[in-house]
């Protein structure tokens, strides 16, 4: 029996469940590796083109704009090609765009390349998460966090490999990881080609009342993640920590986020979606409060590490629920992901504005308060999360 709004097309699943899961995991690792190598290449790109902070921000904004524009349109893309093939096409496009960034001779060319990279990253993000949501539904138990653990591990590997190869030149730092990401996508492609749902009705709809709470939680979670990534090192440095050690805060954040995602499926299965998100946001808020009230290296590592542990499974759970809530997995996840990516862009800017008006510690306190409010919201019925999975 089909939904009244849609006419679901038959599934085109030809591979066994474990092969579908591994292939989709490969797409997550490839996507994370691309983001990691781009993050590692930013300082070298800035130096190669002699960009100021202001002009570099234009290129970074182009990447974000490409992603935000592509994500809501991915419902149409997944409708035409299904989420599996869409992941493959977007994955190859993302790798090619990353390689093109290394060859950009000017700011204009750089912005064009970063816009395409952002758009293909965003498209791949929606397609692979939609596919993961379908696989999780068939699997019969929570597995979304394991996919996001693959993304985080890929990001760490891409950053390390890109940083090392970048010593031989910016082009190597981007094309090397991009080629490996392409290889992962190519290996996964035969399975992904038969993956995903298609549907016969409208392929994109405005977020429904059931999706809006999930989109709001995604916005808060990813804005917090972006703020920690951009400001944790600066906060420790202003607290008197030597620059070489200030990176320890973000390292603790990333390590505990990866660890939390590796064990996240068991947590969700045992605690349910509402408790996982609510408690996770509470832990993140507590971690930010620790960092604000205990300045210095130890307080920063403990506090921001708790933030990583708390946020680890918030976005995977939200995407999983959104994929089951929307008219299709692609549309539901696109609604949450677009809001989340906007938060990733806006969060650091708001923290910077508050830090300029008051100080960075006050901005961290504000972020802690927002996380605690999100914890209360997620724990209530209004948060759109069930007590079970």
Stretches with model-predicted labels:
Residues 70-82, 166, 260-273, 355-356:
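Helix-to-loop junctions at the C-terminal end of transmembrane segments
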Residues 122-137, 312-326:
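Intracellular juxtamembrane helix-capping segments at the cytosolic ends
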Residues 38-39, 209-259:
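Extracytoplasmic gate region of multi-pass secondary transporters
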Residues 14-41, 47, 115, 208-224, ...:
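Pair of pore-lining "gating" transmembrane helices in MFS-fold secondary transporters
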Residues 69-105:
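Conserved MFS/SLC helix-loop-helix module at the cytosolic interface between two early adjacent transmembrane helices
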Residues 85-99, 275-290:
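Structural signature of the two symmetry-related core transmembrane helices
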Residues 50, 82, 103-108, 294-295:
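Helix-breaking motifs and short loop linkers at transmembrane-helix boundaries and internal kinks
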Residues 172-190, 362-380:
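Symmetry-related core transmembrane helices of the 12-TM Major Facilitator Superfamily/SLC fold
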């Amino acid at each position: 029996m089909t939904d009244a709004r849609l006419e679901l097309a038959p599934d085109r699943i030809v591979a066994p469940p474990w092969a579908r899961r591994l292939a989709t995991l490969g797409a997550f690792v490839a996507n994370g590796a691309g983001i990691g190598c781009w993050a590692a290449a930013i300082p070298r790109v800035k130096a190669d083109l002699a960009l100021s902070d202001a002009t570099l921000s234009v290129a970074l904004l182009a990447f974000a704009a490409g992603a935000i524009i592509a994500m809501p349109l991915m419902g149409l893309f997944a409708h035409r090609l299904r989420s599996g093939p869409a992941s493959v096409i977007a994955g190859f496009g993302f790798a090619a765009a990353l390689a093109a960034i290394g060859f950009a001779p000017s700011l204009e060319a750089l912005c064009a390349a970063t816009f395409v990279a952002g758009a293909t990253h965003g498209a791949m993000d929606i397609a692979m998460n939609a596919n993961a949501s379908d696989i999780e539904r068939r699997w019969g138990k929570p597995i979304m966090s394991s996919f996001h653990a693959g993304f985080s591990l890929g990001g760490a590997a891409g950053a390390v490999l890109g940083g090392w190869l970048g010593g031989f030149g910016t082009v190597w730092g981007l094309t090397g990881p991009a080629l490996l990401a392409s290889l992962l996508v190519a290996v996964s492609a035969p399975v992904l080609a038969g993956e995903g749902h298609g549907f016969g009705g409208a392929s994109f709809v405005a977020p429904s009342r059931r999706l809006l709470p999930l989109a709001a939680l995604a916005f808060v979670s990813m804005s917090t993640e972006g703020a920690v990534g951009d400001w944790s090192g600066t906060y420790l440095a202003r607290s008197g920590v030597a620059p070489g050690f200030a990176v320890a805060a973000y390292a603790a954040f990333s390590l505990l986020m990866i660890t939390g995602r590796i064990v996240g499926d068991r947590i969700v299965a045992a605690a349910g979606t509402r408790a996982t998100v609510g408690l996770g946001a509470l832990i993140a808020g507590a971690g930010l409060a620790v960092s604000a009230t205990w300045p210095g290296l130890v307080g920063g590592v403990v506090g921001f590490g708790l933030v990583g542990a708390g946020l680890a499974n918030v976005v995977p759970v939200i995407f999983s629920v959104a994929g089951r809530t929307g008219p299709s997995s692609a549309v539901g996840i696109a609604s949450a992901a677009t809001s989340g990516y906007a938060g990733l862009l806006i969060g650091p800017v708001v923290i910077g504005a508050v830090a300029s008006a008051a100080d960075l510690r006050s901005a961290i306190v504000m972020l802690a308060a927002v996380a605690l409010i999100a914890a209360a919201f997620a724990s209530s019925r209004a948060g759109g999360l069930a007590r079970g999975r």
